């Protein structure tokens, strides 16, 4: 008898909306029964380009991501196969030579700004979530994160936000909200939403006999 199909949760939302915080909190709540696949680590490998060219890439456009590899890895997890997730170096703007093993699990969380964008990914999901947050709050969080954690300049972060992040959010990310089954305000600061999502996953696990 084959194992039941994993319960797949897609968590999307704008940059610094709290989607990663929510996904990680949900993964901690469910423990070893979760495989978490963050899309942030699936930026295309641009190590062959000089740093100056890598700095000019629009990392908020769908073309910046290796969506084919992300889909391949998501499908592998659903078939019960482990994957070697790439590791992205945000300071070097390219992939690290390291890989992170991700084991299959009864719950698979797909998380990232564009996980609701490709229909092929949406079709894998049992529950689609969009994390909503005020644009000003998202900008401030991103500013702090990129300057303090990723070593970027204040001027560079502001320019990138105005020229790339904001227009790409309006064009590609925000429209995917219409595909969501659940819209979560306040992202990682919303314990009620976390409890609701965890309860939904636990109920499915119980029906699968994996609780």
Swiss-Prot record:
GO cellular component: cytoplasm
Record-linked InterPro entries: P-loop_NTPase, PRK/URK, Uridine_kinase, Uridine_kinase-like
Pathway this chain belongs to: Pyrimidine metabolism; CTP biosynthesis via salvage pathway; CTP from cytidine: step 1/3; Pyrimidine metabolism; UMP biosynthesis via salvage pathway; UMP from uridine: step 1/1
CDD domains with a match to the protein in the record: UMPK
Catalytic activity: uridine + ATP = UMP + ADP + H(+); cytidine + ATP = CMP + ADP + H(+)
GO molecular-function terms, A-Z: ATP binding; cytidine kinase activity; uridine kinase activity
Main location: cytoplasm
UniProt keyword annotations, A-Z: ATP-binding, Cytoplasm, Kinase, Nucleotide-binding, Transferase
UniProt key word Transmembrane helix: no
Any Gene Ontology biological process: UMP salvage
Top EC class of this enzyme: transferase
Subcellular location: Cytoplasm
Enzyme Commission number: 2.7.1.48
Positions that bind ATP: 13-20
Alphabetical list of HAMAP family matching this protein: Uridine_kinase
NCBIfam families: PRK05480.1, udk
PANTHER family given in the database record: URIDINE KINASE
Family statement: Belongs to the uridine kinase family.
Protein name in the entry: Uridine kinase
Species of the source: Thermus thermophilus (strain ATCC 27634 / DSM 579 / HB8)
């Amino acid at each position: 008898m084959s194992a039941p199909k994993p319960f797949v949760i897609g968590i999307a939302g704008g940059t610094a909306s709290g989607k990663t915080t929510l996904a990680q909190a949900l993964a901690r709540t469910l423990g070893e029964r979760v495989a978490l696949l963050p899309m942030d680590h699936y930026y295309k490998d641009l190590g062959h380009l000089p740093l100056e060219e890598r700095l000019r890439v629009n990392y908020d456009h769908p073309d910046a991501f290796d969506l084919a590899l992300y889909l391949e890895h998501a499908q592998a997890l659903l078939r019960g196969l482990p994957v070697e997730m790439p590791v992205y170096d945000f300071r070097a703007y390219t992939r690290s030579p390291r890989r992170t093993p991700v084991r299959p699990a009864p719950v698979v969380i797909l998380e990232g700004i564009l996980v609701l964008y490709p229909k092929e990914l949406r079709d894998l999901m049992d529950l689609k979530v969009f994390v909503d947050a005020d644009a000003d709050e998202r900008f401030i969080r991103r500013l702090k994160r990129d300057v303090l954690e990723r070593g970027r300049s204040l001027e560079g972060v502001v320019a990138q936000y105005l020229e790339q992040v904001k227009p790409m959010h309006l064009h590609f990310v925000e429209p995917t909200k219409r595909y969501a089954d659940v819209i979560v305000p306040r992202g990682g600061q919303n314990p009620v939403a976390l409890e609701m999502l965890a309860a939904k996953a636990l109920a499915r696990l119980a029906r699968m006999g994996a609780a």
